[in-house]
């Protein structure tokens, strides 16, 4: 992937940044693509860096992701909750599966979606093979994970656990307005000048 470069004029001359580094200067983190260990490590490092710089200012996390590995996503969520800086989450395009959990775990009152963003919640996906005992262990683990995810969604949305269980039984797609009504986000971002 080609990463754009931006040129800034400073008192000392010109300085070139890749676009993500320039956005980071403004406390903006881009979470895009599949959630995996490599991406999570990058997001966590950025969160820790910005929090160490100034833990009184908001961090803005723009999310456009189909989701991914639950443990990687939960590492991001745990870091968001660990640092002192408030983390504002903004869905752009798609916040699906694990990415919808990250979106909902943003600072209350600071969880947003752009008007045409889509949010998807569902139960964890997994598979198992091997001996019967190994399959049973994997099944028990995914049920524990499902319970944890449902509890997080209930806490973040204000929906009761039975509603969450029902709605995550299958893919549950939501528009930005539906995600707001459901309680996963607090507002829809629109340009007030247009």
Swiss-Prot record:
Q: Which residues form the active site?
A: 97 (nucleophile), 122
UniProt-listed InterPro entries = ClpP, ClpP/crotonase-like_dom_sf, ClpP/TepA, ClpP_His_AS
Residues passing through the membrane, by range: none
Query: Where is it found, in Gene Ontology cellular component terms?
Result: cytoplasm; endopeptidase Clp complex
Highest rank taxon of the organism: Bacteria
- CDD domains found in the cross-reference section: S14_ClpP_2
Which EC number(s) are documented for this chain?
3.4.21.92
**Protein name according to UniProt:** ATP-dependent Clp protease proteolytic subunit
- Reactions this protein catalyses: Hydrolysis of proteins to small peptides in the presence of ATP and magnesium. alpha-casein is the usual test substrate. In the absence of ATP, only oligopeptides shorter than five residues are hydrolyzed (such as succinyl-Leu-Tyr-|-NHMec, and Leu-Tyr-Leu-|-Tyr-Trp, in which cleavage of the -Tyr-|-Leu- and -Tyr-|-Trp bonds also occurs)
Record's PROSITE patterns? CLP_PROTEASE_HIS
Please give the chief subcellular localization of this protein.
cytoplasm
Q: Where in the cell is it found?
A: Cytoplasm
Residues in a coiled coil are none
Any idea which UniProt keywords this protein has?
Cytoplasm, Hydrolase, Protease, Serine protease
This protein's assembly is summarised as: Fourteen ClpP subunits assemble into 2 heptameric rings which stack back to back to give a disk-like structure with a central cavity, resembling the structure of eukaryotic proteasomes.
Primary role: Cleaves peptides in various proteins in a process that requires ATP hydrolysis. Has a chymotrypsin-like activity. Plays a major role in the degradation of misfolded proteins.
Q: Which GO terms describe its biological process?
A: protein quality control for misfolded or incompletely synthesized proteins
Q: What class of enzyme is it?
A: hydrolase
Query: What molecular function terms (GO) are annotated for this protein?
Result: ATP-dependent peptidase activity; ATPase binding; serine-type endopeptidase activity
Which protein family is it in? Belongs to the peptidase S14 family.
Keyword set includes Translocase: no
